[in-house]
Amino acid sequence: MESGIDLQGQFISALQSLGLSHDLAKLLWLPLPMLMMLIVATVGVLVAVWLERKISAAVQQRIGPEYIGPLGILAPLADGLKLIFKEDVLPANSDRWLFTLGPAVVVIPVFLSYIIVPFGQNLLISNLAMGVFLWIALSSIAPIGLLMAGYASNNKYSLLGGLRAAAQSISYEIPLALAVLAVAMMSNGLGTVEIVEQQSQYGILSWNVWRQPIGFLVFWIAALAECERLPFDLPEAEEELVAGYQTEYAGMKFALFYLGAYVNLVLSALLVSVLYFGGWSFPIPLETIANLLGVSETNPFLQIAFAVLGITMTLIKAYFFVFLAILLRWTVPRVRIDQLLDLGWKFLLPVGLVNLLLTAGLKLAFPVAFGG
């Protein structure tokens, strides 16, 4: 049973019923997914920033944002408006073009990665056969922007931050890719929808986290490092590098870095839920629920209900990991740069390789349980 509705098909059919041609209806549909992607990512970031402030306040026994909107929910929006009206400063003797392009090179690939994130069977922008591979490829572009920003700023702290960002990304991209490859091996594909469908047959027992506990830990640690979250925020360590590659940035350029960091955090949490925790699938298979209720699986109201519940489940799982990442930031000390590189090259890389080989062996030995 499909746990979603075909939004594109229904939108085009609705426009055709109004007298528009199929080609024109399809043309009107094209900008909508990108607009939806921007809205979903931006709202997700606003919620993540608000959670960051409230959770950090709770950890430190403070109140946090309180007056701007109910429970301070509009505080991130106020911050964004404040940064819009700040002066855009260009440092002396800096490289104007690289300095301007740096934030865009960081943010654009992260937003584009949302096209592969599924919230339901048909609730995604593009069901690409190489979806997860596309995300890994796009995530490898962002460090180039950080290096550009650090180099172009004509500041030693910015340059050190950019170099650290490049070294950190290279160190953790490979373990991240190995963890994803192990999941793709079990799912017999790199598409995010295929990966979720493979986990939905038996409910919670089908989730990849039970068959890939080592891969899940490798992926989660590497994802935190890619997001530059504590304890892996070496590129912008305030106590060492002022603000790292962000030191000379102000106004909207600084806001783009800030936005990119939280968009990447929410994206990583969504992908953890998709790859290891069944994405939109429920702990109890929805087919079982439909049979217990005595309702036909093709019932349109049931399809809509399952679509809404699928989005809810995806967000609950994702924001649990956002909460975990925020909690780690305020409870774990920062590692040194040598410890960070040792963790990536001497621990996560060998563990990721062993996990991949172990997955291949188990797939051959137990093909039913491991997707043979």
Curated annotation (Swiss-Prot):
Subunit field text: NDH-1 is composed of at least 11 different subunits.
GO cellular component: plasma membrane-derived thylakoid membrane
Any one GO biological process: photosynthesis, light reaction
Enzyme class: translocase
Reactions catalysed: a plastoquinone + NADH + (n+1) H(+)(in) = a plastoquinol + NAD(+) + n H(+)(out); a plastoquinone + NADPH + (n+1) H(+)(in) = a plastoquinol + NADP(+) + n H(+)(out)
Identification of the protein by name: NAD(P)H-quinone oxidoreductase subunit 1
Ranges in a coiled coil: none
PROSITE patterns: COMPLEX1_ND1_1 (PS00667), COMPLEX1_ND1_2 (PS00668)
Subcellular location: Cellular thylakoid membrane
Function in brief: NDH-1 shuttles electrons from an unknown electron donor, via FMN and iron-sulfur (Fe-S) centers, to quinones in the respiratory and/or the photosynthetic chain. The immediate electron acceptor for the enzyme in this species is believed to be plastoquinone. Couples the redox reaction to proton translocation, and thus conserves the redox energy in a proton gradient.
Signal peptide annotation: none
Family (UniProt): Belongs to the complex I subunit 1 family.
Main localization category: membrane
Entry keyword set: Membrane, NAD, NADP, Plastoquinone, Quinone, Thylakoid, Translocase, Transmembrane, Transmembrane helix
Membrane topology: Multi-pass membrane protein
Family matches, as NCBIfam families: PRK06076.1-2, PRK06076.1-5
Domain of life: Bacteria
GO molecular function, one term: oxidoreductase activity, acting on NAD(P)H, quinone or similar compound as acceptor
EC annotation from Swiss-Prot or TrEMBL: 7.1.1.-
InterPro entries noted in UniProt: NADH_UbQ_OxRdtase_su1/FPO, NADH_UbQ_OxRdtase_su1_CS
Organism expressing this protein natively: Thermosynechococcus vestitus (strain NIES-2133 / IAM M-273 / BP-1)
Transmembrane segments annotated in the record for this chain: 27-47, 65-85, 97-117, 128-148, 176-196, 204-224, 254-274, 308-328, 347-367
